[in-house]
Amino acid sequence: DYDKLTAANEIGKIATAKIEIMLEVLNYFVDKLETESEAYSRKLQVNIQYLLDSMLTSRRTVSVSQEFAVRVTDSYNDESKSEGQFAVVSFAYIGGILKMLKDDNNFQGKEYPLVLDGPFSKLDPDQRQNVVNMLPTFAPQVIVFSKDDLHDVISNDNIGRVWTIVSNDEKNIARVEEGKLWK
C-alpha cells in the first residue's frame, strides 16, 4: 500500500506533506469558485430581472444558474419567447454583466464602450423604445450600427455623433462620412 511505503522513508513523508498541502489549496479554490459563482449568479439574476422588467412589455421571471445559464419563463413556467423577446433577454444579459462590472471595484473608473450591430431589427416598437431608453445606462458610450434612421427613436440628448457608411454597390467600395446622409 502506498501510504505504508511512503511513510517508511523521509522522502516519502515530504511527498505526502506536499500532496496534503496541494489538496488543501485545491479545496480552498473549489470552495471559493463555488461561493463566488453563487454570489455572482445571484447578482446577475437581479440585474437581468430589473432590466427585463424595464424593457419587456410582458412579465417574465429570470433564473441564472451557477454556470451563468439564463432561463426566462412566463407565469406558466414556459420558456418559449418571440424573436423580439429573445433579443430583449440578450440585451438584459449584456446590461446585467455591464452593471456588475460597473459595481466591481477592479473595474471602477474604467470606461468600455458597448458596440451593437443592428440591435433593433427584431423588436416591436414598444420593446425597441424600452431598450433604447435603457441603453444609456449600460455603458458611458454606446455605438450603434443600424441601417435604419434612429433619430425618431433615440433622443438627440443621447446622440453624440452620427457617421454614415456610404457604399458604391457597383465597385463594392465604401467610405465613412460624418453626418446623417440618408433620406
Segment roles from a protein language model:
Residues 59, 67-69, 120-123, 133, ...:
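Eukaryotic, compositionally biased intrinsically disordered regions
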